[in-house]
């Protein structure tokens, strides 16, 4: 999460005033979903070798008062960029935007992204297009998201909005003042666990990672908490011994964290923890029992189908044999009748 205390919020007129429409001037906070970042990184990996950056459109939701924007999805937009000019496939952008809005009616256009931290004249030109009237985000500000994708370096993410600067009318289209705004990458507990499981396969030779059981997950969580407590204890001891500089903000954060701890006896905590362990064991036992029962049911069903097919074959064979016997008896009776007729003719 970005440090929200290092940002200043300014009033931001985004263009010429329209009758009955006023631009939003409230502070803005941006929430980014992880799937949007992954889509941007995937787009960066598929870019041409001669492209320094790629761009695309950001879609998401906006709060009723316009003070919070949530970036949920995005799609790539083709463009060519040289030292003298930039060309963006706006027709493709409009068609894809209409298609996405038709599939997700609750989402709206919120801005655009680029895989470069550099802000230049071309960035201002694209920003003014996305924040303009008609097909843009007017009267709300267009959010510009930059994601650095340099190999071997950490991924840096920044968010901006823009405001016009005092230039001539001829330079208004490619001029803008980019203002940083706070942001946060918000993800659920399930998404975090999934990402951790995927990250564990990074160093494996077969690129595979096994899922943890409930007991293993609980053990890992306890180890992480103990590790964090150990780091905090070492930091506090180093500050007390004047080996490390003190931080008022960090001290206030630790004080607030300790204030949230419930004031209960250690014996009660141990009792509750043991009960939780028992609950986890019961759930794990029931899950294994259900899994075993399902496997047994599948095996019984397979065996029943196999035995049922054999019985049908045997019954069919018995029927054929009995039919053959009946046919043979009829033939014997016919031959016996013929012999009696011949004997009577001879006597006559």
UniProtKB/Swiss-Prot annotation:
CDD domains: MPN_eIF3f. PROSITE patterns: MPN. Signal peptide: none annotated. Pfam families: JAB, MitMem_reg. Residues 30-166 form the MPN domain. One of its GO terms (molecular function) is translation initiation factor activity. GO terms for cellular component: eukaryotic 43S preinitiation complex; eukaryotic 48S preinitiation complex; eukaryotic translation initiation factor 3 complex, eIF3m. InterPro entries: eIF3f (IPR027531), EIF3F/CSN6-like_C (IPR024969), JAMM/MPN+_dom (IPR000555), MPN (IPR037518). Component of the eukaryotic translation initiation factor 3 (eIF-3) complex. Residues 328-341 have a biased composition (Low complexity). Keywords: Cytoplasm, Initiation factor, Protein biosynthesis. GO terms for biological process: formation of cytoplasmic translation initiation complex. Residues 312-348 are annotated as: Disordered. Belongs to the eIF-3 subunit F family. Residues 312-327 have a biased composition (Gly residues). The keyword Iron-sulfur does not apply. It is found in: Cytoplasm. It comes from Coccidioides immitis (strain RS) (Valley fever fungus). Component of the eukaryotic translation initiation factor 3 (eIF-3) complex, which is involved in protein synthesis of a specialized repertoire of mRNAs and, together with other initiation factors, stimulates binding of mRNA and methionyl-tRNAi to the 40S ribosome. The eIF-3 complex specifically targets and initiates translation of a subset of mRNAs involved in cell proliferation. This is Eukaryotic translation initiation factor 3 subunit F.
